[in-house]
Every structure is written in structure tokens, then in C-alpha cells.
């Protein structure tokens, strides 16, 4: 789980636009966040396996 202070800090609008970064909406993880879903790779995988993301399927080739 992310530190609450860092989650609050990321929610504020930065002074310069390039300093802004995405965080997972579910757990607050700052790295490897898919912008389309707003989730990190860990949460995306968990929710996809449970079927909570409509239209997302496990690929196989």
C-alpha cells in the first residue's frame, strides 16, 4: 500500500505540468499504471482474473 501522504501529494495539481504522474486508483502504486484503466499491473491482473473488468480476457497463442 502506498503512503497516504504521497497519495495526497499526487492528487494535488503540480506547479509544473511535467511533474504530474499517475497512480493506481485502487492501491496507490506509482509505477506501471495503465492509463486506460487507471490501475497498476498488479491490480489489473487481479481484477481481470476475477472477471471484474468487462471485455478483458487472458491472451493465449
Curated annotation (Swiss-Prot):
It comes from the Bacteria. SUPFAM superfamilies: Glucocorticoid receptor-like (DNA-binding domain). Zn(2+) binds at residues 24, 27, 40, 43. Its cofactor is Zn(2+). One of its GO terms (molecular function) is rRNA binding. One of its GO terms (biological process) is translation. PANTHER family: 30S RIBOSOMAL PROTEIN S14, SMALL RIBOSOMAL SUBUNIT PROTEIN US14M. Binds 16S rRNA, required for the assembly of 30S particles and may also be responsible for determining the conformation of the 16S rRNA at the A site. Part of the 30S ribosomal subunit. Contacts proteins S3 and S10. This is Small ribosomal subunit protein uS14. It comes from Parafrankia sp. (strain EAN1pec). The gene is rpsZ.
